[in-house]
Design a protein with these regions (language model features):
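Bacterial N-terminal signal peptides
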Residues: 2-10
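The feature marks long extracellular or luminal low-complexity segments
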Residues: 11-281
Length: 281
């Protein structure tokens, strides 16, 4: 009976001595040390987002977990077992930013538009862990080497959002997101906005009338892109003839087959041009 009592007391003492100490701050991709108390052999288990390992350890010594086992950020559990088990949870945080995923929409925008460009940036460490710790992302919009807009945005739930206007000149707009020494760049093509001050001229031909526009610009002076459609309309009393013509090298031209005194006009989108009156020959 005395022997059984000694064994029971020893088991209680071992139960009281067994303890697991985990790091208060761990970083992805770095080795960690887990402390234990007591003496003798035990079995160690580590359970994490993508890891599950088991090996024998000696109580009272530090258990070193190699960096390869902590590359994925998240919640981990360390378990040490003898005749019973003790466990402790700890969190592995992402490492420093190593890359930015940067999405910008759309890829083509008219000039002079408010809040027409949208961007979203997400930071990842070298192991692909999304970084949730709040940080400041710097956005810059530049065209022809000059900065148009600079904005600093605090991440929320790992995401930094951008809404920005387009510039006034057609051409490539570079949109850059930066976080510390990491950056990503995207290019948005700025094109002319709607035509402005549409004007036409014309002359009689044996088959009707030949009309063309003056060089077409938007209100900021940018040439409208080739392919922009201009609709020419010729009226002679109740008779109406229409021709759609694409802009080529800033000008749209059309041959309209119509007779008599004509009133010719042009329109592109919501923009109306001047009216041209051509007398019958």
């Amino acid at each position: 009976m005395l022997g059984l009592g000694v064994v029971a007391l020893a088991a209680v003492a071992l139960s009281q001595d067994l303890n697991v100490r985990v790091p208060s701050a761990a970083v992805a991709g770095e080795s960690i040390s887990i402390g234990t108390t007591g003496s003798g052999s035990a079995t160690f288990y580590l359970i994490g987002p993508t890891v599950s390992l088991k090996h024998d350890v000696q109580l009272g010594s530090e258990i070193v977990v190699p960096s390869k086992q902590t590359e994925i950020a998240g919640q981990y559990k360390a378990v040490v077992c003898v005749d019973h088990c003790q466990s402790a949870d700890f969190y592995v945080a992402p490492a420093k930013p190593a890359s930015l995923t940067f999405l910008v929409h759309p890829s083509r925008v008219p000039v002079g538009q408010n809040d027409v460009i949208s961007g979203v940036a997400l930071a990842f460490d070298e192991f692909g862990n999304l970084i949730f710790e709040p940080s400041t992302v710097d956005f810059q919009l530049a065209a022809k080497g000059s900065a148009l807009t600079t904005r600093s945005v605090q991440t929320q739930n790992a995401i930094a959002w951008l809404r920005a206007p387009s510039g006034k000149a057609a051409g490539a707009l570079q949109v850059t997101a930066s976080l510390h020494d990491v950056s990503a760049r995207r290019v948005v093509q700025q094109v002319a906005s709607d035509p402005c001050n549409l004007r036409i001229k014309g002359q009689r031909t044996p088959k009707g009338v030949l009309v063309e526009t003056e060089p077409i610009r938007d209100c900021a002076g940018n040439p409208v892109p080739d392919g922009t459609v201009v609709t020419f309309t010729a009226k002679n009393g109740n008779e109406i003839s229409t021709v759609d013509a694409p802009v080529k090298q800033d000008v749209a031209r059309a041959q309209i087959q119509a007779k008599g005194t004509l009133v010719v006009s042009a329109a592109s989108g919501v923009v109306m041009g001047n009216e041209l009156r051509l007398e019958a020959q």
